[in-house]
Design a protein with these regions (language model features):
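C-terminal transmembrane helix and the adjacent membrane-cytosol boundary/short C-terminal tail
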Residues: 118, 175, 206, 252-282
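Hydrophobic alpha-helical elements at and bordering transmembrane segments
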Residues: 85-89, 93, 123-130, 170, ...
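Generic hydrophobic transmembrane alpha-helix motif, especially the helices
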Residues: 129-165, 172-173
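Transmembrane-helix boundary motif in ABC transporter permease subunits
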Residues: 98-128
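Transmembrane alpha-helices
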Residues: 156-160, 192-226, 253, 257-258
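Short cytoplasmic-facing helical segments at TM-TM junctions of multi-pass membrane proteins
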Residues: 126, 169-214, 235, 239
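Transmembrane alpha-helical segments of polytopic membrane transport and secretion proteins
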Residues: 1-43, 267-282
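Periplasmic/extracellular loop-to-transmembrane helix junction in inner-membrane transport proteins
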Residues: 21-22, 26-30, 57-102
Length: 282
């Protein structure tokens, strides 16, 4: 309740205005929970690295077989100084991004379009299962013969690693839409395309973005496998070359860069998800 200073009349507050106190408390609890999770993760990682470094310092054979965190950090610094870290990360990142984009675009469009026809989806299903069961590394020699040893072959490997997953997750989201909502739109006179555009696609976004996060790793694996088979640059080439020379710490250094790249790409996908689906922030 508020009082008017001039008239002395009492006015009630607008009940539609949100109370900032519960909102602030909710945000604080969420921030505190995130901080606790992050602190726990850092503690576990620090304990693991400390144990790893101690064991390799006590045993030369273990140091040769597994490297050590200090040696890995040394190789990371060396690779950063000579520029190979940034060059290889850029190459692998470009291949991964292109494969991620093309694979998800094609897979999502096909997956959503299968919602239109139950007959077509039943016809296509065994072929999708068959393609999804093929190990991507088995296709590498064929891809190299078709597209050569350059960028296109790595992008093709990355795309093939992604497309089936994107297709399945988007189709799952489309067919999982509440039938009652579809029937309601039909009774209101909506066409099939309007139902698809205004209901099916928005309702499928949760599954689509879950697939996007999952396919970041698949796209990166496809690019790395392509670099294993035939490449003179990239993180996959760095891992393969260091492994063939038994430089285990350098292998782990390149793996650390690969993990960092995957985390960055996943973080970007998460930001885009929260931008397009603001209700997911709650």
């Amino acid at each position: 309740m508020t009082a008017d200073a001039d008239t002395g009349m009492v006015h009630s507050m607008d009940e539609s205005e949100p109370n900032p106190i519960p909102v602030a408390r909710h945000r604080w609890k969420k921030l505190r929970a995130t901080a606790v999770v992050l602190a726990t993760q850092v503690a576990i990682l620090a304990a693991f690295l400390g144990f790893w470094d101690y064991m390799t310092a006590q045993n030369r054979a273990a140091a040769f077989m597994f490297g050590s965190p200090s040696a890995i950090a040394g190789f990371l610094g060396q690779m950063a100084r000579d520029g190979s870290l940034w060059r290889d990360t850029y190459v692998t990142g470009l291949e991964t991004l292109l494969g991620f984009f093309v694979g998800n675009l094609v897979g999502t469009l096909i997956g959503l379009s299968l919602w239109y026809s139950r007959f077509v989806s039943r016809v296509v299903e065994p072929f999708v299962i068959a393609l999804g069961s093929i190990p991507i590394i088995a296709l590498a020699p064929i891809i190299i013969i078709w597209f050569g040893t350059g960028l296109i072959s790595k992008v093709a490997m990355s795309t093939l690693s992604v497309v089936i997953v994107a297709l399945v997750t988007s189709y799952k989201g489309a067919v999982g839409v509440d039938p009652d909502q579809i029937n309601l739109m039909r009774t209101l006179g909506a066409s099939k395309f309007q139902i698809f555009r205004k209901l099916v696609v928005p309702a499928s976004l949760t599954d689509i973005f879950a697939g996007l996060k999952l396919t970041v790793g698949f796209a990166l694996i496809g690019a790395i496998v392509g670099e294993f088979m035939s490449s003179s640059e990239g993180l996959g080439h760095a891992i393969f070359k260091a492994g063939s020379l038994y430089i285990i710490p350098k292998v782990f250094a390149a793996l650390v860069a690969t993990i960092a790249l995957a985390l960055i790409l996943t973080f970007i996908v998460g930001k885009i998800e929260r931008l397009l689906m603001p209700w997911r922030r709650l």
